[in-house]
Amino acid sequence: MKVLVINAGSSSLKYQLIDMKNETVLAKGLCDRIGIDNSFIKQSRGSEEAVILNKELKNHKDAIEAVISALTDDNMGVIKNMSEISAVGHRIVHGGEKFNSSVVIDENVMNAVRECIDVAPLHNPPNIIGIEACQQIMPNIPMVAVFDTTFHSSMPDYAYLYALPYELYEKYGIRKYGFHGTSHKYVAERASAMLDKSLNELKIITCHLGNGSSICAVNKGKSIDTSMGFTPLQGLAMGTRSGTIDPEVVTFLMEKENLDVKGVSKLLNKKSGVLGISGVSSDFRDLHAAADAGNSRAELAIEIFCYGVKKFIGEYIAVMNGVDAIVFTAGVGENNSVVRNMIISDMDFLGIKIDEEKNKLRGQEVDISTADAAVRTLVIPTNEELAIARETVRLVK
């Protein structure tokens, strides 16, 4: 059974074709600059170098057609025709309170996802456009929606409600939803396998650290709290996002900097985080290079980020009354040994200690704890596409 996984953004579309018989990626690619000049599709097979084709992609329908064309191409393709695709799994950022699990897509589901646009105006519209484009081109192939938010639907109300007038929650659905759920769930399950223990007997803190970052407290396989909130802006300082700040700063800035709602949203989402602090970059590789060259603000940005992660780990140890494993995942979590070391340092009183040599390993599943550590510290590469494909198979079989 071959599953096509689609992750549609506003001007890009990432995809993977996975053979679920042995869970191997047959091909993966990217359609970029959709609706913009100089658009292209890039595809690679296995370990082969990617092939890049300049192609006019006026909209997402053009992009999906380009994907099918590339997958079935005599030279760069991996299947003979579209009929070899058994199902399509779509990543959808926000399911609101309407979805607490992945679902087979039908018109009712589409309408419910559209109703979530209010709470996810940046992310859900391109996700919807991607589904509609697939439905036009592959009308007879079953499609599944996998939501970033559903793993966090197990959070208790005292964890997800904000202390605003309760009527605002009832009227607008203002509450913590959490994101990166597919990743948090996947790495928690992998941690359970690595530790050879049932998820039901484990307390795990998963740290998804990339350009967007979030922490999750996973107790007995369920998310009981997470750092992102109503939007992905809450929580840690990230690549370009401020993370949690005093809400009065918003009104102060609007007045002092003469900003409107869009202006202050752009400031908090696109110009803040480690980019805003450092003035250098949102990329940690650039920050480390600048810090090594003596840039104190780049060094400060890294310290602020690591301090934030450390605080969430402490918070979640408290709410779970302990922890068995801490997991690092995503681009920074998997590959940045300096950041991992800064986060874990000075937590040995909790039994959290890492081996410096093991910590140098990058991008592979590894236990980096010392032999005598009471808490296991694991590095686990995330695989959201495989997780989406597995959910798709589960629902369409």
UniProtKB/Swiss-Prot annotation:
Mg(2+). Can also accept Mn(2+). It is found in: Cytoplasm. InterPro entries: Ac/propionate_kinase, Aliphatic_acid_kin_short-chain, Aliphatic_acid_kinase_CS, ATPase_NBD. The record marks H180, R241 as: Transition state stabilizer. Substrate binds at R91. Keywords: ATP-binding, Cytoplasm, Kinase, Magnesium, Metal-binding, Nucleotide-binding, Transferase. Pathway: Metabolic intermediate biosynthesis; acetyl-CoA biosynthesis; acetyl-CoA from acetate: step 1/2. Mg(2+) binds at N7, E384. One of its GO terms (molecular function) is acetate kinase activity. It holds the Pfam family Acetate_kinase. Its cofactor is Mg(2+); Mn(2+). One of its GO terms (biological process) is acetate metabolic process. Its main location: cytoplasm. It comes from the Bacteria. It catalyses: acetate + ATP = acetyl phosphate + ADP. ATP binds at K14, H208, L209, G210, N211, G212, D283, F284, R285, G331, V332, G333, E334, N335. It is an enzyme of class 2 (transferase). GO terms for cellular component: cytoplasm. The active site is at D148 (proton donor/acceptor). Belongs to the acetokinase family. Homodimer. Catalyzes the formation of acetyl phosphate from acetate and ATP. Can also catalyze the reverse reaction. This is Acetate kinase. It comes from Ruminiclostridium cellulolyticum (strain ATCC 35319 / DSM 5812 / JCM 6584 / H10) (Clostridium cellulolyticum).
